[in-house]
Structures are given as C-alpha cells and as structure tokens.
Amino acid sequence: MNIPNDPAILLSYINTKLRDDFPDLTELCKTLDVDQEALTKKLASIGYDYNKDLNRFM
C-alpha cells in the first residue's frame, strides 16, 4: 500500500491508523505491507519513536 512519503504527514497518518485500526505497529505493517524497520527509522529521523504501551509514535 502507498503511504505518505513526507515524514510529518506520515507521522499523522500512522498514528491515526494505530489509534483507529490496529492493535500494534507489527499488525499495521503486516496489513499495509510496510517495512517496519524503515518506517521506524524514517519517523526517528524527525524525533519520533514508537511507544508500544500507548500504541503511537511520540
């Protein structure tokens, strides 16, 4: 699936999907066929890390 390329827009998109549709990042990545490591690195590049307890990037 195509996901936003811009990191700031990607952050909003992923957090919304996590909040509304997925129990965790692993399920989101499997369902959307997204490389979890690449996604995590891209969002880390703008200062956001995944918090599994809150199921969101912060």
What are these regions (language model features)?
Residues K52:
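Short, acidic, Ser/Thr-enriched surface-loop or helix-capping motifs
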Residues L28-C29:
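Short alpha-helical "recognition helix" segments of helix-turn-helix
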Residues M1-D20, D24:
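N-terminal acidic leader/helix
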Residues V34-D49:
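Short acidic, Pro/Gly- and aromatic-enriched capping/linker segments at domain boundaries
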